[in-house]
């Protein structure tokens, strides 16, 4: 298992305008599922063959959050979202790359650029592959959502030993009625329940960032306390 670690230089934080960020990376060529799981439990995120976590000076606003699947019950509004999507086709498969994927990805980010002032980058086939397809091994999947044979949402996930790691989701803003972002997460929860998995690892919750603060609405949940290195015995999560 080839592993290469490195860090970025300090830069503008993408989530909080008044903060600076620094990211630690681990490139792992053929990461076993159990190592992926241990890294995710310790606050790392996987994109392709790269694992990353923030190591920012004087800031700990990025908090790893996970949903407690066994205690999670769908609310009335969440059941309405499921009912609205009664005819939405959902396919669980290994990560794909197509013109359809890239078009949908670009459309979603153009919308977010206008709505939330996100920085948008044109992504090539190779860049998309490196970020969302490469390194899927025996744990990486995508949930592909179709309405009338049109790809309207892609939710990239890792199915691990104790839960599902939610990597990235993008959808067609023209289908906002269907609440596809929320519907994709509800599908993750349903899959985890069927597979007797304990957690949905949602990545980072940042209270002052609108794009990430919503994660706390999914309760019950737990927050990772502190940063633990790989193979340290105790990893503390608290409600």
Curated annotation (Swiss-Prot):
Pfam family, one: ATE_C
InterPro entries: Acyl_CoA_acyltransferase, Asp_Glu_LeuTrfase, N-end_Aminoacyl_Trfase, N-end_Aminoacyl_Trfase_C, N-end_Aminoacyl_Trfase_N
UniProt entry keywords in alphabetical sequence: Acyltransferase, Cytoplasm, Transferase
Protein EC: 2.3.2.29
Tree of life domain: Bacteria
Main location per the UniProt record: cytoplasm
UniProt KW Acyltransferase keyword: yes
Example GO molecular function: arginyl-tRNA--protein transferase activity
One GO CC term on file: cytoplasm
Record field: catalytic activity: N-terminal L-glutamyl-[protein] + L-leucyl-tRNA(Leu) = N-terminal L-leucyl-L-glutamyl-[protein] + tRNA(Leu) + H(+); N-terminal L-aspartyl-[protein] + L-leucyl-tRNA(Leu) = N-terminal L-leucyl-L-aspartyl-[protein] + tRNA(Leu) + H(+)
GO aspect biological process, one term: ubiquitin-dependent protein catabolic process via the N-end rule pathway
Family label: Belongs to the R-transferase family. Bpt subfamily.
PANTHER family: ARGININE-TRNA-PROTEIN TRANSFERASE 1, ARGINYL-TRNA--PROTEIN TRANSFERASE 1
Function: Functions in the N-end rule pathway of protein degradation where it conjugates Leu from its aminoacyl-tRNA to the N-termini of proteins containing an N-terminal aspartate or glutamate.
Protein name in UniProt: Aspartate/glutamate leucyltransferase
Organism of origin: Campylobacter jejuni (strain RM1221)
Encoding gene, per UniProt annotation: bpt
